[in-house]
Amino acid sequence: MLTVLDDYPIHQTPEPLAHVSTSDHNFYDRYWYNAHDRDGLFYFGVGACRYANLGIFDCSLSLAIDGEQHAFHGSRRAPEEAGDLSCGPFRIEILEPMGRHRVTLQENETGISCDLTFVPTSVCV
């Protein structure tokens, strides 16, 4: 199956990008962001993972404030378009490839919501 990303010169095999180049069920692509305050009283972590060979997309946002943890978790069937980085109220947007990323979590039953933009402080290696 061809996807919108197949128009870009980013292939690593002759197959369409929707075809994973390994049959390993543990193969995945993941996003991970985190931050904390200098005193260690506040921490948050955001993760999203696409398990292409399992057909699963998972996401989470975890906050630790004054020693208490609060969390949102989401999971869905992986969308056919790898560029669809949403799961219910959770979404990642690539504002600038290898640069700025935006993470939003709309109002949901956990009471946690956010609109965060991550800006790199070093080059990608």
Give the residues covered by each predicted segment.
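Targeting-peptide/extracellular-domain and disordered-appendage signature
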Residues: 1-125
